[in-house]
């Protein structure tokens, strides 16, 4: 009887672990609105190194190896929501925002602001594989330029 109970208990733990892992990474999970069928995880971190410069570090992880994955566009805004400038990966000098044939991609983008003013960024992530694609939009926190 002890062996049967022990086996049932172990099976229950294994099933719980498998289900927890599957749901934690499940695309279109309401608990993780950043996830979809192509994008598993996104990160945006903002910093103010000095001289009015704002730096935004962006990262995106796909649900597997993607044909194309990265940042399709980044828009810099004043804290009041006024949009200042926007850059896409197809523009000259911004090709590094997109990666190809990989499962994740990271990039850092700088914006020249004015010391003492507060800014934030809106980052548009993109991933595609075959004929399908998905996108996620994220805002950074507001930061004051130094």
State what each model feature region is:
Residues 2-24:
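Sec-dependent N-terminal signal peptides of Gram-positive bacterial secreted proteins and lipoproteins
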């Amino acid at each position: 009887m002890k062996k049967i109970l022990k086996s049932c208990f172990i099976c229950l733990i294994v099933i719980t672990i498998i289900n927890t892992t599957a749901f934690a990474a499940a695309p279109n999970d309401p608990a993780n609105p950043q996830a979809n069928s192509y994008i598993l995880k996104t990160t945006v971190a903002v910093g103010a190194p000095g001289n009015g410069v704002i730096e935004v570090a962006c990262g995106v992880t796909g649900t597997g190896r993607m044909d194309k994955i990265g940042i399709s566009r980044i828009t810099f805004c004043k804290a009041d929501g006024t949009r200042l400038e926007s850059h896409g990966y197809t523009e000259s000098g911004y090709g590094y925002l997109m990666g190809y044939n990989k499962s994740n991609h990271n990039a850092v983008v700088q914006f020249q602001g004015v010391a003492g003013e507060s800014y934030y960024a809106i980052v548009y992530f993109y991933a595609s594989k075959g004929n399908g694609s998905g996108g996620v939009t994220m805002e950074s926190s507001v930061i004051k330029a130094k």
